[in-house]
C-alpha cells in the first residue's frame, strides 16, 4: 500500500500538459542556476536576464531612470552595464558641446562687423584696427606750404618769383635773333667771297663768278634748233 501511495503521489505531482511541464522545468532550472556579479553577489539567472532585457530596452529609448524601478538584481545588472552606456552618452554630450561651441563661434563671426578699410599698409608694415589714410600728394603740399611761408616772410623773393620770364621766348625775340645771325653771315660771305647770298649774285672783288646753269632762253633756242 505504501508503494501505491508513493506512486500515486508521483502521478499526481507529474503535470499532464506540456506548458506545465515547461514551467516546472524552468522553475527547476532557475532555482539551481545563479550568476555571480562583479561585486561577488550571486543573482538568479532569470532575474538577471529579465533585468538586463528591460535595461537594454530602456537604454535604446535613451533613459536610465527605468532601471531603478526594477528589482535590486536588475538595478545591479544595469549598473554593471552602465560604464559603456555612460561613456557613449558622455561622448555624445561632448560632441554636442563641441558642435555648440563651433556653432556659437560661427554665429559670433557672422555677427561681428566687417573691418572694412581698417588695415593700412604703411612703409611695408601692416597696421590693423586703425582707420588711417595717406594722401598721395602730402609731401608736395607740404613743400608748397613751406615755399609759401618763405615768400610771406621775404617779399623780395616773392616779387622775383612773380617776375620770372616764361619758359619759351616770344616769337619776335626769336625772329630778331635769327635775323641778326643771317645778317652777320651775309656780311662775312660778301667780304670773303664777294658774293651776295641774299640776292644770289656776284659782287666786285677778288673772285670771278661764272654761271653753271645756262640761261632759260638760250636753252630754249637750242632745243628749237
Swiss-Prot record:
Residues that span the membrane, as ranges: none
Pfam families per UniProt: CDI (PF02234)
GO cellular component, one term: nucleus
GO MF term list: cyclin-dependent protein serine/threonine kinase inhibitor activity
Keyword Disulfide bond among record annotations: no
Bias kind Basic and acidic residues: ranges: 143-153
Biased composition (Low complexity): 71-82
Chain positions covered by the region annotation Disordered: 47-94, 130-169
GO term, biological process aspect, one: regulation of cell cycle
InterPro entries, A to Z: CDI_dom, CDI_dom_sf, KRP
Keywords on record: Protein kinase inhibitor
rRNA processing found in the keyword field: no
Biased composition (Basic residues): 55-67
Positions of disulphide bridges: none
Family: Belongs to the CDI family. ICK/KRP subfamily.
Name of the protein in its database record: Cyclin-dependent kinase inhibitor 3
Organism: Oryza sativa subsp. japonica (Rice)
